[in-house]
A protein has these predicted regions:
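Extended, structured, electrostatic nucleic-acid-contact surfaces
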Residues: 3-11, 202-227, 235-238
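Gly/Thr-rich phosphate-binding beta-strand-loop-beta motif of the actin/hexokinase/Hsp70
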Residues: 7-28, 104
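Nucleic-acid-processing active sites and adjacent nucleic-acid-binding tracks
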Residues: 31-55
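Short alpha-helix plus adjacent loop in nuclease-associated cores
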Residues: 80-119, 123, 127, 168-170, ...
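Glycine-rich, often acidic, oxyanion-interacting loops/wings at catalytic, nucleic-acid
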Residues: 129-220
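Phosphate-backbone recognition surface of nucleic-acid-processing proteins
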Residues: 220-223, 229-312
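Low-complexity, acidic/Ser/Thr- and charged residue-rich accessory regions of DNA metabolism proteins
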Residues: 266, 304-344
């Protein structure tokens, strides 16, 4: 059994297995060591935990966990959300609600690294970013769909979204006489949906920027080269508490911008970057790296890495550096500034 003396500030240590209807709550009294493992209906969870003193509560960082964490914090409890992959090794028995709740408890007392609990503003930014990503995906799918259909009628559309928007109306109108009216009408409807998506994306982006600019480090992130409004919004959510990452390198590794390595017998081999990461933010950072590489104001370090490494490797290296710089400005609470070059 874990040493409970280190948790003497809490009345109980609790592990909760979240569900849609019935929650499983595993608790241990820090004074007596008494253990309970009971089911509680969803609408009774807050009531059952309202009058049990200050508790340390652990939950898996899964769907609705942020909501429950804020509700439990409002009751005066301390809440730690933990990555489900880190909790799984602590589940000792066959899969069941009781075993899951017990596993969450053991992960909690073992000191598994916690995920930050988002504020309501951070939650709203995250939700809007998710909505924006879906709209961008839908818009891209529709554009490619229209581009493929128009190619069957001899029209080759430009790759740029702006150029596509300027040319597509003319191409659809030129189909008069070459295609049946239903084809033309359907293409026009699809193009209208594309424009509607673009308008919604712009509306979401304005609100995302407005909310993100209310956060503490928004203006600091925008001083980092290559960081724009969208990356800044992601960083405001992810680095609201930069101390959850022990170093800039750990943050870059979390984003999948550090290559994996393997080996044994004293020989280590560096391989590709991992696939399990925040791919949306990593993609945006790589896009920012491309923009920085094209900039006339790029630093000497960027010029050197572009000259020495293959282009894609260089882009990941620049994105890695951007992520580290974002962590640094969030940790220090100050703008990014270029380090002066000193003579040897």
């Amino acid at each position: 059994m874990a040493n409970l003396n280190q948790f003497c500030d809490f009345t109980k240590l609790i592990g909760i297995d979240i569900a849609k209807s019935v929650f499983q709550i595993y608790s241990c009294d820090t004074q007596t060591g008494e253990i309970t493992n009971m089911q509680v209906k969803r609408d009774k969870v807050l009531e059952s935990l309202a009058n049990c003193g200050k508790c340390l509560i652990g939950m898996e960082a899964c769907g609705s966990s942020q909501y429950w964490a804020r509700k439990l914090q409002a009751l005066g409890h301390t809440v730690r959300l933990m990555d489900t992959k880190l909790v799984k090794p602590f589940v000792r028995h066959n899969k069941s609600d009781k075993a899951d709740a017990e596993g969450v408890y053991h992960a909690l007392v073992s000191g598994v690294r916690a995920v930050a609990v988002k504020t309501e503003t951070e939650r709203d930014i995250q939700t809007l970013l998710t909505m924006r990503a879906l709209l961008v995906k839908q818009r891209t799918a529709r554009i490619n769909h229209v581009r493929g259909l128009l190619a069957e009628y001899g029209h080759v559309m430009p790759k740029s979204v702006d150029q596509f928007d300027k040319k597509v109306d003319e191409c659809i109108n030129s189909l008069e006489g070459d295609a049946v009216q239903l084809v033309i009408d359907t293409l026009r409807d699809t193009f209208k949906s594309i424009r509607d998506d673009q308008d919604r994306i712009k509306t979401l982006q304005r609100e995302i920027s407005r909310l993100a600019n209310q956060t503490r480090n928004a203006k600091h992130f925008l001083t980092v080269p290559g960081v724009g409004e969208t990356i800044m919004a992601y960083m405001c959510v992810l680095l609201a508490d930069p101390t959850q990452f022990s170093s800039a390198r750990q943050f870059a590794a979390y984003l999948g911008l550090v290559p994996m390595h393997t080996g044994s017998g004293g020989k280590t081999v560096t391989t590709k970057i991992p696939g399990q990461c925040d791919k949306a933010l990593r993609a945006l950072l790589v896009q920012g790296a491309h923009a920085m590489a094209r900039s006339k104001c790029r630093t000497d370090w960027v010029k050197t890495i572009l000259a020495k490494k293959p282009k894609k490797v260089a882009m990941v290296a620049i994105a890695n550096r951007m992520a580290r710089q974002c962590w640094a400005v969030a940790s220090k609470g100050q703008d990014w500034r270029r380090m002066p070059v000193t003579a040897a």
